[in-house]
Regions:
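Alpha-helical interface subdomain recognition
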Residues: 1-3, 77, 86-172
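Structured core elements
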Residues: 3, 20-23, 40, 63-65, ...
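Flexible, small-/acidic-enriched active-site or ligand-binding loops
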Residues: 10, 42-76
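Residue-level signal for inorganic ion chemistry
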Residues: 6, 39, 64, 103, ...
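Residue-level preference for beta-strand/loop junctions
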Residues: 16-18, 58, 128, 165
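A short core secondary-structure module
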Residues: 5-49
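Short alpha-helix boundary/capping segments
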Residues: 12, 31-33, 54-58, 85-98
């Protein structure tokens, strides 16, 4: 049994989680890979206080305070960094895929608006400046799609370039 003390900020969907995987430092210094330990804590355990935070982007997050909350070891003590690296890379890629879907929906709605909204008796999509903007948006989306699909393939293949691809999806 491990006792966890400290806080975690902006935990996505933390207010609806039954179990919390808490990244803790059990030895070493800040910045060291060794000494990071993963602990599983019940969200309703004594010493756990969850406060929901409404985010501007409509994501649900929470701030979680741990005051001697008891939890169970996940994996090996002090060896959680390798598991954490893979998990965070996968999360970055999957969030990028989610955001790509959202931006594609926005683009489809934009194109529909360009086709239906009229100004001076013609659809505004016939205006050259708006055509250029739509073309630029399309190119950016296609580039992002290419990066996300490549990153998803790297995730499926457990590629050595997974971390690099995850970083690239964040940049796009």
């Amino acid at each position: 049994v491990y006792k966890v003390t400290g806080s975690k900020k902006f935990v996505l969907d933390g207010h609806v989680a039954n179990k919390l995987i808490v990244v803790t430092r059990t030895s070493g210094n800040a910045g060291d890979r060794d000494g990071i330990t993963l602990v599983l804590v019940d969200s309703d355990a004594a010493g756990v206080e969850v406060t929901r935070t409404i985010m501007a982007d409509s994501r649900n997050a929470s701030n979680i305070e741990f005051s001697g909350a008891e939890g169970q070891l996940l994996g090996e003590e002090g060896k959680g960094a390798n598991v954490l690296d893979y998990t965070l890379d996968a999360g970055r890629i999957l969030i990028a895929a989610e955001m790509l879907g959202s931006v594609e929906e926005c683009f489809e709605r934009t194109v529909e608006y360009l086709k239906t909204r009229e100004q001076f008796g013609v659809p505004i999509g016939s205006f050259q400046a708006l055509k250029h903007r739509a073309a630029q948006m399309f190119c950016e989306i296609e580039l992002s799609k290419s990066v996300v699909l490549e990153a998803l393939s790297a995730l499926d293949d457990d590629s050595d370039q997974l971390a690099e691809m995850a970083s690239l999806t964040k940049a796009r």
